[in-house]
């Protein structure tokens, strides 16, 4: 995910972030399935998706902590 995309995610609402997180988790599931069956063309995509999931989870957690303060 590029820096510009991260800035856009930080300004989006939590419902959009949760939806995007669900989409990425589904994509990761499909990529792992393709890897197991030997059909995955770009194994680096798994790493990219996992990193994007972590970034979105971090943004969601930052918002939760900001609300508590």
UniProtKB/Swiss-Prot annotation:
SUPFAM superfamilies: Ribosomal protein L29 (L29p). Pfam families: Ribosomal_L29. GO terms for molecular function: structural constituent of ribosome. Belongs to the universal ribosomal protein uL29 family. The lineage of its organism: Bacteria, Bacillati, Bacillota, Clostridia, Eubacteriales. Keywords: Ribonucleoprotein, Ribosomal protein. One of its GO terms (cellular component) is cytosolic large ribosomal subunit. It comes from Clostridium perfringens (strain 13 / Type A). PANTHER family: 60S RIBOSOMAL PROTEIN L35/50S RIBOSOMAL PROTEIN L29, LARGE RIBOSOMAL SUBUNIT PROTEIN UL29C. The keyword Ribonucleoprotein applies. This is Large ribosomal subunit protein uL29. InterPro entries: Ribosomal_protein_uL29, Ribosomal_uL29, Ribosomal_uL29_CS, Ribosomal_uL29_sf. The keyword Ribonucleoprotein applies. One of its GO terms (biological process) is translation.
């Amino acid at each position: 995910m590029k820096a510009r995309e991260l800035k856009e995610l930080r300004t989006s609402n939590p419902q959009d972030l949760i939806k995007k997180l669900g989409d990425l988790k589904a994509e990761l599931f499909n990529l792992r399935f393709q890897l197991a069956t030997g059909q995955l063309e770009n194994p680096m995509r798994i790493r990219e998706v996992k990193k994007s999931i972590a970034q979105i989870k971090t943004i969601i957690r930052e918002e939760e902590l900001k609300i508590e303060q």
